Design a protein with these regions (language model features):
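Acidic, low-complexity glycine/serine/threonine-rich segments
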Residues: 1-171
Length: 171
């Protein structure tokens, strides 16, 4: 993601890059990679332009949801199907600055045969331990109607461990 630096009096561009580790988890890029990119870009930039290559904040998230099934549906099976569908929704990594449409999660769950209604979807910041140390007040970036979780231009959201970071309650 390339963003014009609004705080700069010069023609400065901020280029945010992120890398993946061997397990396909997001990680900061090495100084060597940043230097190689900067060297390559220098041959194409205007003389007055400056480019800063920066790491975005990696915000690890967790998704909690509550749903209702009819009395004839096996609740364990419904929960497993629902979690799998949300995992499929997050198979591709998000882009830097890309919002999360909470309504898509509602839509995916509501379209399941096993689910009668989705009563709640909540996205929570996971940090520390196995997760990034970065924190972000997600409520501040959630739309007033709760449909979209916006992302600052220097942030990338990651569902790092889909098998652990999606939890649901079925009633």
């Amino acid at each position: 993601l390339i963003v014009r630096d609004q705080d700069s009096f010069k023609r400065n561009l901020n280029l945010y890059i992120v890398s993946e580790d061997a397990d396909r988890n997001l990680t900061t890029s090495s100084p060597l990679l940043k230097n190689n990119i900067k060297t390559w870009l220098n041959q194409y930039r205007m003389i007055n332009d400056t480019i800063d290559i920066l790491d975005p904040k990696i915000i690890n998230i967790k998704i909690n949801f509550s749903a209702v099934t009819d009395t004839s549906t096996d609740k364990t099976e419904a929960l497993n199907v629902a979690i799998t569908e949300i995992q499929d929704l997050f198979t591709e990594k998000l882009d830097i600055g890309q919002p999360i449409y909470i309504t898509k999660i509602y839509d995916v769950l509501n379209n399941l045969d096993e689910i009668v209604d989705v009563t709640n979807v909540e996205i929570i910041n996971q940090n520390g331990g196995l997760y990034s140390d970065e924190t972000l007040n997600l409520k501040q970036y959630t739309s007033a109607d709760g449909r979209i979780l916006y992302s600052p231009e220097n942030v990338i959201y990651e569902l790092k461990y889909p098998n652990l970071d999606i939890q649901g309650t079925i009633r």
